């Protein structure tokens, strides 16, 4: 593994990625969208990796991908980008299975029996 990739793997915050790759950024934009920017960066990197036939993606490619991901959030927002599952589901279309409801109903019945016994 190259020194560049080792250093890259040691980064833990979005700000560290921006500094390490030499990408200028507005801290307010990154603070609000950090996870979304990094997720989009990862998406762009995967596309570049496929184009480069699995060869190690260069530092310049990493920088371009991060710049592109950051630029997306200068003109868009997390809800519009829909990178995470919570933003991908349609509003009002949440699914709650019976296996989640039945234990709650049973617990409520047991609790009401205990309460009515205590009152008597």
UniProtKB/Swiss-Prot annotation:
Keyword presence, ATP-binding: no
Key words, A-Z: Nitrogen fixation
GO biological process, one term: nitrogen fixation
One Pfam family in the UniProt entry: NifW
Subunit text: Homotrimer; associates with NifD.
Family in the record: Belongs to the NifW family.
Its biological purpose: May protect the nitrogenase Fe-Mo protein from oxidative damage.
UniProt protein name: Nitrogenase-stabilizing/protective protein NifW
Taxonomic path: Bacteria, Pseudomonadati, Pseudomonadota, Alphaproteobacteria, Rhodospirillales
Gene that this sequence comes from: nifW
